[in-house]
Amino acid sequence: MIPNQRQNLVSILRVCTRKGLSDQGGQVHCYLLKSGSGLNLITSNYLIDMYCKCREPLMAYKVFDSMPERNVVSWSALMSGHVLNGDLKGSLSLFSEMGRQGIYPNEFTFSTNLKACGLLNALEKGLQIHGFCLKIGFEMMVEVGNSLVDMYSKCGRINEAEKVFRRIVDRSLISWNAMIAGFVHAGYGSKALDTFGMMQEANIKERPDEFTLTSLLKACSSTGMIYAGKQIHGFLVRSGFHCPSSATITGSLVDLYVKCGYLFSARKAFDQIKEKTMISWSSLILGYAQEGEFVEAMGLFKRLQELNSQIDSFALSSIIGVFADFALLRQGKQMQALAVKLPSGLETSVLNSVVDMYLKCGLVDEAEKCFAEMQLKDVISWTVVITGYGKHGLGKKSVRIFYEMLRHNIEPDEVCYLAVLSACSHSGMIKEGEELFSKLLETHGIKPRVEHYACVVDLLGRAGRLKEAKHLIDTMPIKPNVGIWQTLLSLCRVHGDIELGKEVGKILLRIDAKNPANYVMMSNLYGQAGYWNEQGNARELGNIKGLKKEAGMSWVEIEREVHFFRSGEDSHPLTPVIQETLKEAERRLREELGYVYGLKHELHDIDDESKEENLRAHSEKLAIGLALATGGLNQKGKTIRVFKNLRVCVDCHEFIKGLSKITKIAYVVRDAVRFHSFEDGCCSCGDYW
């Protein structure tokens, strides 16, 4: 074959590669085979690259295996194909095999395999490749440096990524993009914006591209920096990026405004997108749902369904997930009914969200039915059910389903293990919890995280074994975090261990002085013990620092309308009726059950009458008060469902228990920790929460 003819065929192969024309590329391959002398090292490498990029890995391997001679380009093209097709471990395996055959990598080989390490979160392998780069002098090459920044960022080593970035001499736009994206991935939104400022000052040849600006908008949306986000929006307009044709950037703007609570601006940006993506639709629908605009959210979803039947599983599961979090059963069922008509509605991730929705709405039987009907179950499916059982106080069922999962040869991950340990904790199953914890590393090879230790601390503490719980924290091989100390402090209050509580409180105020929850917990510890001076000091210290605790919020759905209440709020139009209803309920509780329990659990040094008024203003009581006011105290056999963002307090718990006895109404309350099903004076938690 004459050189010009071979060169023309190579040019055709490059076009086929760029445009994904595997059939036409295959015809060129056949012609080269028939010509006898057409295939050589160069044309074979082009064929491997073409087949890989056209998603034909088997054909790429056929060419590779038939080559009498291979060079680094041959190996690198095949590795790139593995990464492109999602076989990341395959690429790393080829990298090792190439080394065994004595072929040295080039910058492209290093970049490809560092990318694989980042996507696999394979830090150890990434470190080995970095060491190899240093050994043969490739680290300073900009392509390799960029890939190192990306790898370290994805593996959670942002400081290492920054060190490599600083050593890159001739930084390209890709270098800056990798560092900005790394900071965003690590949650350092401000640093991402600062890096963009440095990039502007560096005056690089290339202007920011869509990737740069999308990362910056993510930095603002993930940290709630609306002012900075608006500045980026202004930069987009001035730079000519903000136009209806730029769907990626405009979609990121929608996401920014949604996450910062600016729905009007989000809708305005959304309406400007000509080719709306599924992500932009999902962002806006979720935004309306999260702000309580459920009618608007459902309307948008129906409009999306009319325009596009290919709604993906991520959008469906995300929207159902919002209704699950708000425990909106009616809307969740509507979404389920719409989802089953779509091809993606039967995917495992969507069905997982449906099961989760039923569990979070308190319908265990419905959740079990959906779970049983699922054809394919992944570890998330089992984790959802284990978590749900735990929240409902069904610890034995959680443990049983965990072992059933193992019998189906599905290995638990660290989240699944956290769910079953938490279930044991909520149900007081100390022996089972300790046994499961011992198998975490030993049997399943999962390195315990601080959250796993926190479950065991909670397990021991609920049984009154506070010294053992403290000893576990002191001796565990990882650094304790704020959450585990807060768990122990809460247990000290429950068991009245003031001395240990003081010790734990000092640790918390030292390591997390800006967290209002710590001052509230210390105040409650002292208040319950009647140490009013110490309680006042804790509250005053929190006030001096300008800290405010998260307000209690509850909601209840009545006649297709969701009513939200905040503790101490009196803005609801039926507030006078609600207060009278609650007073009447309290009167009946006193007369029929001798109810005075709440007075000793109201943690303020005020007179009894004021305590009673404070307790009556708790958000869950206001929600129940509305349900009783609209339906009357005589709704025998009915069920009232209330949902709260924080843990239910002791007084409200006792109040609802008594109420379920005198009214013969069942009450289901989901708080931040678990479900409480009240019936005939008893709670499903067994007063253990």
From Swiss-Prot:
PPR repeats: 5-39, 40-70, 71-105, 106-140, 141-171, 172-206, 209-243, 246-276, 277-311, 312-342, 347-377, 378-412, 413-448, 449-479
A Pfam family the protein falls into: E_motif
Natural source organism: Arabidopsis thaliana (Mouse-ear cress)
InterPro entries in UniProt: DYW_dom (IPR032867), E_motif (IPR046848), Pentatricopeptide_rpt (IPR002885), PPR_At4g14850-like_plant (IPR046960), TPR-like_helical_dom_sf (IPR011990)
Region (Type E motif): 484-559
Annotated stretches, region: Type DYW motif: 592-689
Region (Type E(+) motif): 560-590
Family according to the record: Belongs to the PPR family. PCMP-H subfamily.
Domain of life of the source: Eukaryota
GO BP, sorted A to Z: RNA modification
One GO MF term attached to the UniProt entry: zinc ion binding
Protein name per Swiss-Prot or TrEMBL: Putative pentatricopeptide repeat-containing protein At3g15130
Alphabetical UniProt keywords: Repeat
